[in-house]
Amino acid sequence: MKTIFHNANVITMDDARPRAEAVAVENGRITALGSDADVLALKSRAALIDCRGGALLPGLVDAHIHLLAYAASLISVDCSPAAVSSIAEIQDALRRGAAHTPAGRWIRATGYDETALAERRHPMRWDLDAAVPDHPVRLIHRSGHASVLNSLALALAGVGIATEEPPGGYMERDLTTGEPTGLLMEMDALLDAAVPRIDDAELAQAVRRASDNLLSEGVTAVQDATATNGPDEWQTFRRLIVEGHLRLPVTVFEGYESLGKLPRQALGGRLRRGPVKIAISELGGEIAPGEGELAAMVWQAHRRGRQVAVHAIGQRAVHAAVRAIEEALRRKPRRDHRHRIEHCGVCSPDLAKRIGALGIAVVSQPSFLYHSGDRYLKNVPREDLPHLYPFGDLLRAGGRLAAGSDAPVVPPRPLLGIQTAVTRAGRLGAVLSPQQSLDVAQALLMHTRDAAWSAFQDDERGSIEPGKRADFVLLSNDPASVPPDEIADLDVEMTVLAGQIAWPPSSRRST
């Protein structure tokens, strides 16, 4: 059936035709766009949806999320800065969680940030023991790169004084006894093997909530950037889509350890294989994998014709990622490789120029500046602050930027990401490196066309053009027409997937 969305301020993100008033859709694809008069002339047997003057944009693309972890966080004990401000409050939250959890069953808690706690330190096993002695507890850091376990959980995981850290991992120990304090960094492989997975029914319920949350924010496609994705995770995503719990199309990054094990796509493109994910950890001034091993990993993916996505935050890691990609391209040039650096937290102007010259995409998180800006001002070395999430430098160097939330690290709120890319303002109002600000059009590109481009999907989504998927978000106003610090307050009035209103569920706007 044909549908026409009319009386809209259509912001197409297509340079050849940036604006329109109406869009016609059939069989999930855009068939026409133009003035109301021109498109409504095609209205025979069409359903009409009156957009009432709102801004109709391409559906927003979250180019870096951890979807299963985000879903799990929705059914975990909330220890985020919005929920707790001290270790005592973490203990209270865990006690509440334990009150309706059978003894002996694992308790999962997420989102703590030691810099937002009154004590300004990580909780330790003994803090958790005092609150919940009869349940194993895994308390996951906001970053996803650290966990604190209580004594029962450490015992079940087989972690003790004789345990050796894996390469790139770190286990904090009591300086006197050598006993683990419970804080483990970059040791997910060990923990994931020890901690029982969420059962299928719980996961399905959580993913349905996560999917609805994303749709309510105007997100119509996601890229799951989890470094441990493999065949099991692929099958999980496939099942969740088939059973109707996950309504969004998903691009699944392939963890390096699973290189070559995932199919290209399934379910008519609703599930796709993305780039090969390689994560660089940065602990104690060292990076892991080291530069030689990293270069070999990038080469193994590149020589197979694959795209890589390298997690690199600090400047040393970013530099190593650039060198590895540069070397792979020297050995085997490839014009449209679209290799990616995920995050790119600190990057000098010279390094930004190399990134631009090599055609590397940077997929970053503007919302981090909002949620952590005040912490960055306190903790980031002064000489690095001008180069913190340097979106302006990267674009001036000819680079391309895409945006993701990195949820559950921060909530998936793309309008806040767009706002923060423009304002560079933290939650308490401090502005970080204003010379790195973008204009609204550039910030929108990060969340639409260039986010799709970063996964080789700009032929399908990211702009409103005939032939592309009819994925839209209807906003209450044009983001460029409101004060920049009010962009996040715009209402998402409608989210459309393949021509069908996906959010709100019962919304039907017609004349």
Regions from the language model: what does each represent?
Residues V23, M171-R173, V492-W503:
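Active-site and channel-lining beta-strand-loop segments
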Residues V298-A309, R316-H339, H343-C344, P349-K353, ...:
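His/Asp/Glu-enriched, well-ordered alpha-helical/loop segment
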Residues K2-N7, I11, D15-L259, V276-I313, ...:
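Divalent metal-binding segments
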Residues I30, D38, G54, E114, ...:
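Short, glycine-/Ser/Thr-/acidic-enriched flexible segments
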